[in-house]
């Protein structure tokens, strides 16, 4: 599919135009939502605030990952300098992410999507899978097995800091600085325990949310090996609640992102509407939410299968 068959040159120029104001607002809202969750738990420390707070923080941690994705593509802000600065410090560092390492692999995924050379293919090639198999995967996530592997890897990176590459070392140092700043802030406010909540969300919730987000984008699509993104990638028409948890910052419009990766996230919704109005999506059945998605990527009981 060629988007130029459906969009004018002026529309494409508008869709790919960056806005520093909108980008700054998205980053600010991301941090304000995190702050609001911590404030609610700190002011009213009760299971009725802490348990939902941990779940929502897992979604916000994915939100930081989406900002890393956008800054890595150089599409959030107009200047490369701002994309790098915000991506490194305000998006990647809170979860010890390495934006440059991430985007190198991600760009290969964009070039090779729809082929057997897609580096992300093993993550969703087997779908649809049985509900029992998906439940086992999510059980590993929610019991911390997946997150603890990540945490152990981070521990090894910190212990071996001098031996890391300059790029990797800088990413780890930024993560240490930002996380120590969070711990220091909570300690100064007399609520150091809130940092533990951040870690718990990272270990026990964020892996499951990230898995569902990844499944939503490419699993059980019409044809993983078709070069047309309409066949190998999916968009979900989800409401605010579903998007906030599993597809923050409009990343649920993933088909549009694969059709034209130069479009910032704050224009993807408009791009989807334009293409839908002009028949580009005729015959495509978009899931209404992530529960609908999970029904589509799973099937009934099956025999023994790999985890």
Q: Residue locations for each model-derived region?
A:
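Non-catalytic, topology-defining segments of multipass membrane proteins
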Residues: 1-58, 67, 92-197, 265-307
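Active-site-flanking alpha-helical
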Residues: 37, 72, 76-77, 225, ...
């Amino acid at each position: 599919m060629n988007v130029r068959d459906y969009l004018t040159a002026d529309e494409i120029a508008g869709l790919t135009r960056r806005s520093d104001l909108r980008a700054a607002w998205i980053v600010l809202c991301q941090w304000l939502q995190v702050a609001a969750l911590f404030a609610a738990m700190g002011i009213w420390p009760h299971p009725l605030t802490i348990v939902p707070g941990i779940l929502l923080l897992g979604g916000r941690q994915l939100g930081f990952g989406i900002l890393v994705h956008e800054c890595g593509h150089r599409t959030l802000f107009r200047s490369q300098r701002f994309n790098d600065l915000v991506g490194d410090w305000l998006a990647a560092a809170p979860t010890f992410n390495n934006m440059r390492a991430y985007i190198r692999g991600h760009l290969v995924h964009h070039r090779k999507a729809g082929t057997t050379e897609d580096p992300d293919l093993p993550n969703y090639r087997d779908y649809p899978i049985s509900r029992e198999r998906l439940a086992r995967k999510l059980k590993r996530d929610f019991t911390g097995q997946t997150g603890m592997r990540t945490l152990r890897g981070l521990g090894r990176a910190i212990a071996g800091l001098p031996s890391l590459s300059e790029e990797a070392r800088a990413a780890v140092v930024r993560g240490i600085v930002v996380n120590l700043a969070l711990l220091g802030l909570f300690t100064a406010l007399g609520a150091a325990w809130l940092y533990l909540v951040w870690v718990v969300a990272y270990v026990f919730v964020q892996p499951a949310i990230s898995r569902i987000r990844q499944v939503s984008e490419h699993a059980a699509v019409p044809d993983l090996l078709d070069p047309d993104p309409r066949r190998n990638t999916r968009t979900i028409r989800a409401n605010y609640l579903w998007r906030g948890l599993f597809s923050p910052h409009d990343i649920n419009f993933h088909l549009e992102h694969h059709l034209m990766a130069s479009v910032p996230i704050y224009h993807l919704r408009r791009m989807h509407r334009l293409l839908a109005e002009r028949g580009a999506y005729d015959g495509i059945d978009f899931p209404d939410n992530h529960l609908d998605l999970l029904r589509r990527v799973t099937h009934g009981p099956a025999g023994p299968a790999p985890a």
